[in-house]
Each structure stands twice: as C-alpha cells, then as structure tokens.
Amino acid sequence: DLDHFKMVNDTHGHLVGSRLLSEMGDALKTNCRLIDFAFRYGGDEFVILLPQTSKENAIYVAKRLHKLIRETVWLTKEGLDIKITPSVGVASYPVDSKTKEGLLHLADEAMYLVKNTNRDSVAAANLGILPENSDAEEAAGEAAAQ
C-alpha cells in the first residue's frame, strides 16, 4: 500500500495518480523473477506472489522492493519529481496460512500494523514490524535470491 497516495491525486490530479500506479506496477514486475506475479490489487495496493520462496526470502524481497519504491523519484519523464513510501505486509504459505484468503488477510494485517504505527516500513505475519537490512543482510539476501 502506498503511503499518502491520496495526496498525489489531490495535488497533481487523478491522471498523474494513475500514471504513478502504472509506473509502480512496471517497476515491481521488472524487479521480480519470471516466476513471480506482481499486480495491482485495488486502489493503491499491490500484491506480489513469490512461488517457491521461503518466508525469509520473501521478507528479503519485500525489504528490497520497499527500498526501491522509497528511493525512486517517480514520473520524472512527465516533469514531476514524486517521492512516495510504501507500507508492506508479508505472509507466507504454508507457514502463516494454507489458504489464499488467509494469506491476504494476514498480509493485510501486517500492512495495517505498519500503517497504524510509523508507515514506510515492512511487517510480516507473526513477526511484526521488521528492521531495515544491514549491508551484510543485503549481500546474504542477494546471494540467496539467485
């Protein structure tokens, strides 16, 4: 979920908001593996499915994508410089739930934990809000993800 996305629509208009969502979707797809699925779920929420991925690696991917979103300046080709942050929730099959409804519910709960505290972070089902990766964790996660 994108933090304060309504402000983008209110400030720049819904067309710019739609362009931002489209660019965001493209960036998410580009930064996932070929077997992964990244799609807009509704409003300013995206879902990313990571088949054959452990919860630990899913958390690594979530943190990496979180960093990508918060550090990117969006819509520069349109002459805009939009910065936005995400609130991210992670749930894993079969560790957290064995149903798609359960996974979405738990990922939503984790995301709302972030939204209701400090925003701009990642939380995982049954683990709470997660610290940012250190450089060593980044390197280990990159190696594991390949």
Regions found by a protein language model. Name each.
Residues 21, 25-28, 62-63, 104:
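Heptad-repeat coiled-coil signal-transmission/dimerization helices
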Residues 2-16, 28, 32, 45, ...:
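Active-site loop/short helix in cyclic nucleotide turnover domains
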Residues 10, 50-53, 70, 93-94:
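Residue-level recognition of strand-loop junctions within catalytic nucleotide-signaling folds
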Residues 84-86:
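PAS and PAS-like sensory/regulatory domains
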Residues 55, 59, 63, 78, ...:
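Catalytic-core segments of nucleotide cyclases and related cyclic-nucleotide turnover enzymes
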Residues 37-40:
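A short pre-motif secondary-structure segment
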Residues 1, 43, 107:
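Conserved metal-coordinating catalytic motifs of nucleotidyl cyclase and c-di-GMP turnover enzymes
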Residues 30-35, 67-79, 111-113, 117:
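Short catalytic/binding micro-motifs of nucleotide second-messenger systems
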